[in-house]
Amino acid sequence: MAMNCEGEYGHLIMQDLILPATHSAPEVMASYARFGRRIHWVDGNNMPGAFQMNTCWWYKPNREQILSNPKSQVGKPHHHSYPEILGFYGSDPENPYDLGGEVELFINGESHILTKSSMVFLPPDVPHCPLYVNRVDRPIFHFSVVMNNLYTFDGERKFTAE
């Protein structure tokens, strides 16, 4: 896997988007592009030894798109056998705590409305989602970090960069 920097530690620096096969399918990328843009996806496949993290910008609401797609991974509750942290950040440098929109996240069936920049810790096996972007006034930066080398649901389905 080619990385972007040279030198002894250049292989530890990712500057391009390298998605797992399941996320790089044209229909998946087109669907995501309707409301946001992925920036990076790091995992044990494209950076051996790394835990999984992905980043993106959200530009438009996604609620209707999620509700109309029964295959959406964030449209239904799921859990992981490892902890996860979700981050949601507004893009106004003068007011960094203003999310610049509204995100709704369900944790074990309980709805949480986020309008401030937030980090959410999800312990192992805690059901979470749906995750809806209800309103976007300014771009919202989102990330997900899981303490596992691959992103899996319910301990079953693995997303790998084949």
Where are these regions (language model features)?
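A short beta-loop-beta micro-motif enriched in histidine and acidic residues
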Residues: 69-85, 93-100
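A short beta-strand-loop-beta hairpin characteristic of the jelly-roll/cupin
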Residues: 88-115, 153-157
